[in-house]
Amino acid sequence: VLHAGGKFGGGGYKVSGGLHGVGVSVVNALSEWLDLNIWRDGKEHYARFEHGDTVEHLRVVGDAAPGEKGTEVRFLASSKVDGGTGTFSNLDYSFKTLENRLRELAFLNSGVVIRLADLRHAEPIDVTLHYEGGVEAFVRHLDKSKQPLLKDVIVIRGKKEGIELDLALWWNDSYHETMLCFTNNIPQRDGGTHLSAFRASLTRVMGGYIESSGAGKKEKVSVSGEDAREGLTCVL
């Protein structure tokens, strides 16, 4: 039996994906077969599932190399192609979609190395994604074709009540804002309370600075949220 849950206790959701303990279980249910290799406690373990059912229970198949640990998951999605009775009628994986998502993860987890290989064609595609610098490097990548208004990326990191924040800001000479929000590596396409709070804070801080400097009275300047975010690239 695949156990994907157990993260509710001990503060696990501070760092986990929060898929309600169904991640690999759902992948298994929607696969023709799924193989697991686990290196742990000096041993290599193996289990196999077909159409969601266990066909080879977890067993030790060998020794692990000194210090070797980790998990390898291999699966074949359940298919209706070529007369199959599976789930999916189209198994044309998008390399670009996978590459973009894995690149996000490589930026968000500074120093990690992710390799993506596509062996479906005569000319294989093999990409290694590895970045140092975290969200700062992410922002520089997003703005690589734009003219920055600041020499350095503004990076803010903090921790409060067990919640960690990692924020990078950089303004460029465009009129558009690019704001990417993530929670535990999961993209928040529609933002969230942390995005709303950030926008409100940015507007308040800029307005407060203009007022305290006297520039607002002198030039009769009133800054809106849209003004503060014009040309801003942000990863939160």
Tell me the role of every PLM-derived stretch.
Residues 57, 85, 96, 103-105, ...:
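GHKL/Histidine-kinase-like ATPase module
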Residues 4-141:
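GHKL-type ATPase core
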Residues 3, 76-78, 170-176:
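Short connector loops/turns at beta-strand edges and beta->alpha or beta->beta junctions
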